[in-house]
Amino acid sequence: MLFCPIVEARVVCTSALRLHGAEGAIPLSAKNLGELMLKPIRWNTFIRDFFVIQIGFLLYGLAIALIVRANLGTGTWLVLEVALANLLEIKIGTMTVYMGFMVLILALILREQVGWGTLANILSIGPWLNLFLDFISTSKENPALQIGMFLLGVLIQGMATAIYIGVDAGAGPRDSLMLAVHRTTGVSIRVARGAIEVIVVLIGWLLGGPAGIGTVAFALLIGPSVQWAFKLFKVHLHKPELAEAAAD
C-alpha cells in the first residue's frame, strides 16, 4: 500500500501516483486516498480552534455585507454568487453556501487536501452574511459613506482571513480549488488564481452580477489588507504556496 505522511501528503503522494502510473508497482487504497485528502484534526485544541474560526467567519460575513451594501461592486466570486442568487431568487448567503459546496467538489475531484475548517467555512459564512445583510442598508446616494463602507469591508475581510487561516484547519473551498489547479497543471499560484477569478467574474457579469469599480479596487486592496492582518495577528503560514496566495 502507498503510505503518505500527512504533513507532506501533497508532494509525496503526487509523486507516488506518478510512479504508480509509470511502473504499476504502487497500489493506492481508498483509506490512504482519504488520508491524502483530509487534513487531520487536532482534537486537543479543537474547541478553542472552533471558537476562534467562528469569530473569523462572523467577521467575514460582516465584511462581505458591507461591501455588498456599499454598492460599488464586489469581489470576483461574489459577482457570480449575487448574480445566481438573483436568478434563483434566494438569499446571497444561501447561494454562497451552495457555491462553496460546488467548488469543494471540484477541489476534491482534483484530490486537493481539505480540513474541517473547509466545511466550516462553507456552512458558516453564508448564514452570517444573510444575518448582516438583513441589518445593513444599501447606500446609493452618499459616495463618502459608500467608499467608507467598502474600505471598512476590505479591512475587516483581511482580518477575518488571517484569523481563520491562522487556525490552520484547512483552506476555504475557493483557495482549495486554486491550489488544486496550481498542483495539477503546474502553473503558478498567481496564474491559477488569476485565471479562475477572471472566468468567475466574467460569468457573473454576463449573468448580471454587480461588477464595478469596487471589483477592481477589491482585487488591488485585499492582498495588502490580508498581509497587514497576518502581521497584526502574527500568523505564520507553513505552506509556501499559501504564503504566495496570501501575498497576491
Question: What do these predicted ranges mean?
Answer:
Residues 19-36:
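Short, Lys/Arg-enriched N-terminal segments with co-localized hydrophobic residues
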Residues 5-8, 23:
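Intrinsic structural disorder/low-complexity segments
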Residues 32-248:
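Core subunits and conserved enzymes of cellular information-processing
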